[in-house]
Amino acid sequence: EIGNIPDRICRALAASAGLPSGTPGPVHINCEFRDPLVPEDSQSESACEAVEGKRRAGVSVYPMHFLRDPLSENILDPERATVVIAGQGAEEAVLEWAARSRVPVFAEPMVCGVPEDVRIPFQQTLLDDEEITGLFEQIIVTGRPTLSRPVQAVCASGKRVVVVASYGEWPDLHGSASCVVPSLQESDCVDEARQLPLLEALRERVKEVRAGIEERIASYGDTPSALGVMDIVWQLCPRIFLGASNPVRIADLIAHRHENASGPTQVWSNRGLAGIDGNTSTALGWASACARLEGADYSAVTAVMGDLTFLHDASGLGLPRGEEFPPLRVIVLDDSGGSIFESLEHGRTAPVEMYERYFGVSQRADISALGAAYGVKTRTISSLTQLREILTSPVEGLEILHLPISRPTKDIAHLRSL
């Protein structure tokens, strides 16, 4: 408990000083003191020494406008092989710095524009491999990489963590950050002699995983599967919305499996406690905003979500009279209920009947009839060939593509174990 004290109060103290945003704010800290409230003089020194010996050093937070002398201070430890872990909201300047410095980047699927030379795909698989995580000792975090457990585990593994964030609520779920800076400077450098072997080792591992993914997708032939559908969407669709359940995690497992392929230009997914709430409405709102801003140059949004996610916000399909749907395709991966918990402790330990009742909750809804009730064109897709043909044709208004599939639980477990 004593060791957690710096992590608990560090954010509050940083906010009171305006770090790293530059805007100080009021802070309220609730503290409870143990009896005796005033220790005897003879106890003071030993008590302080006990706390000092047990506590973990607090994080150093640098203000936004703090100018570091490039000759005297390097935030990074150049003696440590370094990687970047980029989550949703990653700062472009950090990705550009990584490309210049030959620092590998593990990125969530919502992070687009990572330079090909340093992008390392399949982060869930690679960062769950101790041989891989043993190759580097320093992590630079940008954005909010909270999608998968392997990423969080490596950030909490005792490696040196540098967070780049210009806002007060910087990402550091485990209190493991060594320092927080609003940006990286040219003086922040790493040792290229350490980085190049790391980059090459990661690329070799990526080749192995890529082959395993290709084999797994090919095993389904032309039959739609969660992996096969996501693979096609990633190849063909420039703007993708991912449902906040299995789809975003499957994208994290297979995105960029095609070497030297550019992939989508924009990817979005709702994050945080909202879960599957409002995914259909969010996709429609994003598509509508993009269509209004871009006009004739609009690149349609393709949304991919599970059946429960779709049904949970089905009323989002409602549209007032006199308004038109934006060009949007909603791909519904119908695996008869919720399957994300099958790959977690719930599915591994609960009896099948209990799991299906409380987590699977397969619905009796007719998705085609539901779409028709809202005046939305709905098609049931039975092959990947058919899906590919549709995705390469123009979309007019809102369209629902209903794909019955098997649950991807075993596929997800297989890809994570490659």
Predicted regions and their residues:
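Glycine/aspartate-rich loop-and-adjacent alpha/beta segment that forms the canonical ThDP
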Residues: 21-69, 387-418
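Terminal amphipathic helices with adjacent charged low-complexity linkers/tails
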Residues: 28-59, 161-200
